[in-house]
From Swiss-Prot:
SMART domains xrefs: AAA
One term under GO cellular component: plasma membrane
Protein name: Putative ribose/galactose/methyl galactoside import ATP-binding protein 2
CDD domains for this protein: ABC_Carb_Monos_I (cd03216), ABC_Carb_Monos_II (cd03215)
ABC transporter domain location: 24-260, 270-510
GO molecular function: ABC-type D-ribose transporter activity; ATP binding; ATP hydrolysis activity
Keywords: ATP-binding, Cell inner membrane, Cell membrane, Membrane, Nucleotide-binding, Repeat, Sugar transport, Translocase, Transport
Organism: Rhizobium etli (strain ATCC 51251 / DSM 11541 / JCM 21823 / NBRC 15573 / CFN 42)
Family classification: Belongs to the ABC transporter superfamily. Carbohydrate importer 2 (CUT2) (TC 3.A.1.2) family.
Enzyme Commission number: 7.5.2.11, 7.5.2.7
Gene3D superfamilies: P-loop containing nucleotide triphosphate hydrolases
Signal peptide segment: none
Length: 513
């Protein structure tokens, strides 16, 4: 029977360690979200005083499991045990009270509060009058930093810190809860090489103090440098656990990508035409650099890479969302400067963003209102009046062509499935008759049937001469749909693969360089 967080906290405080072969373990865990099985009967076992890396492609289920262990999600099935005792974690506070702390990739500090205030928020020491004792809080922070070999002024506001130092503050905050378990999600994604070395020194110190560390990463070199053992997840399933000294880089890649490509991604051979888009030495300071590539009419250029590779940033820069620091862009052989999405649309570019709910669909509006956004002013307004009949007929035809499942165009988009929402967005851009279509994670979060429909539409656009740039974290999709694949790692293009030579292992080798 699972014990309450309060009871487990008492067990932890007493020092009792029943059946503590593992510091933290999960067995038979399942977690579903609408239309998606994120975790299917997975297991995980963390030893005391060890660093345990979690590996897997994007969407493998790593972060979902860690959010369960941190009390952010509750599992639909399965057992979580802390020092051998089954527990139920219903909130992050439950996890913290039981010594489990998660350091998120995004970092969750208050920028206008001091370092000390961030660390001790809601736990501030009080003087005899009930007011916060800033002197004591400063001393507590200095003692904590001394333990971790962190050199940061406790009284400086967080907004003045570098990303690396903010991360150090997050780690110190987690340790301040007397945590037995620290969960780190891609902790080096924004750090320089020297900052990574400092982080690893702190991790080794924490390990020597008996703390168990869960380390989510995509980077092979980090696994071999800092992890004692690792587990691989794939498609929401547990694949295996090994000591990091017992395997090679190729072994891990095979575990991560060990599945065959299905016929769900048939690639139709279409004539490849002239160069439509040419990018030369494109840079965005601190994000990506010297990105160069070409894409031709009728070609699907797949873009692969792991979290932090800069793929989406390149797409946003091409579409005018963020101006580049340097570099050149040519359309049909002529140099262009695209400083806004409006200019990009005028140049017959279209961009399907990776997050349809935040930067794509206007969920509270209906299908018609969503589809017309990019074309209303230019094509359906004459003499100051909207040609409503022509607009509705055009959008109706597009919805039928895309097989959007809806009773009518006045259905609110929030009521549609993820796949149909994506079709509405594609319809919006098809109405602009683009010559260049940039797709960022076009099938993320939609079911298998809807994915096949999206792939059909992408193939149709290529057949009609559109130059397609398709960013995807799904390896079968990249391999199954692309004529060529450009691979990125940490803001750099690490290589190109033609369709006939591309394999999952070759892509992963380039992506993890």
């Amino acid at each position: 029977m699972a014990v309450s967080p309060t009871t487990m906290a008492a067990v932890r405080a007493s020092g009792a360690v029943p059946n503590a072969e593992f510091l933290l373990s999960a067995e038979g865990v399942r977690k579903e979200f609408p239309g998606v099985v994120a975790l299917d009967d997975v297991q995980f076992r963390l030893k005391r005083a060890s660093v345990h890396a979690l590996m897997g492609e994007n969407g493998a289920g790593k972060s979902t499991l860690m959010k369960i262990l941190a009390g952010i999600y509750t599992p639909d099935k399965g057992d979580i045990r802390l020092k051998g005792v089954e527990i139920q974690l219903k909130s992050p506070l439950d996890a913290l009270e039981n010594g489990i702390a998660m350091i998120h990739q995004e970092l969750n500090l208050m920028p206008f509060m001091t370092v000390a205030e961030n660390i001790w928020i809601r736990r501030e020491p009080k003087n005899r009058f009930g007011f916060i004792d800033h002197g004591v809080m400063h001393s507590m922070t200095e003692e904590l930093f001394a333990r971790l070999n962190i050199d940061i002024d406790p009284d400086i506001e967080v907004r003045h810190l570098s990303v690396a130092n903010r991360q150090m503050v997050e780690i110190a905050k987690a340790v301040s809860y007397n945590s037995d378990v620290l969960i780190m999600d891609e902790p080096t994604s924004a750090l320089t090489e020297r900052e990574v070395e400092h982080l690893f020194r702190i991790i080794r110190d924490l390990r020597s103090q008996g703390i168990g560390i869960v380390y989510i990463t995509h980077k092979m070199n980090e696994l071999f440098e800092i992890a004692d053992e690792f587990s691989v997840f794939r498609d929401g399933r547990y694949i295996g656990t090994h000591a990091s000294t017992d395997v090679t880089r190729d072994d891990i890649i095979r575990m991560m990508v060990g599945r065959e490509i299905t016929q769900m991604f048939p690639k139709e051979e279409v004539p490849i035409g002239e160069i439509v888009l040419s990018v030369k030495d494109l840079c965005l300071k601190g994000v990506f650099r010297n990105v160069s590539f070409e894409v031709r009419a009728g070609e699907i250029l797949g873009v692969a890479g792991l979290v932090g590779s800069g793929r989406s940033n390149v797409a946003e820069t091409l579409f005018g969302v963020t101006p580049p620091s340097s570099g050149t862009v040519e359309l049909f052989g002529k140099p262009v400067t695209i400083s806004s999405p409006t200019e990009a649309i005028r140049h017959q570019m279209a961009f399907l963003t990776e997050d349809r709910k935040d930067t794509g669909c206007l969920l509270i509006l209906d299908i018609l209102e969503n589809m017309q956004i990019a074309v209303l002013q230019d094509k359906f307004v004459k003499g100051g009046f909207v040609q409503q009949g022509a607009l509705e007929a055009t959008c109706e035809d597009m919805a039928k062509r895309l097989r959007v499942k809806t009773p009518n165009l006045y259905e609110r988009v929030e009521n549609l499935s993820g796949g149909n929402q994506q079709k509405v967005l594609i319809g919006r851009w098809l109405l602009t008759h683009p010559k260049i279509l940039i797709l960022d994670e076009p099938t993320r979060g939609i079911d298998v049937g809807a994915k096949a429909e999206i792939h059909r539409l992408v193939t149709e656009m290529a057949r009609n001469g559109v130059a397609v740039i398709m960013i995807s974290s799904e390896m079968p999709e990249v391999l199954g749909m692309s004529d060529r694949i450009m691979v990125m790692h940490e803001g750099l293009v690490t290589g190109f693969l033609n369709r006939d030579e591309a394999t999952q292992i070759k892509v992963m080798e380039l992506a993890a360089r």
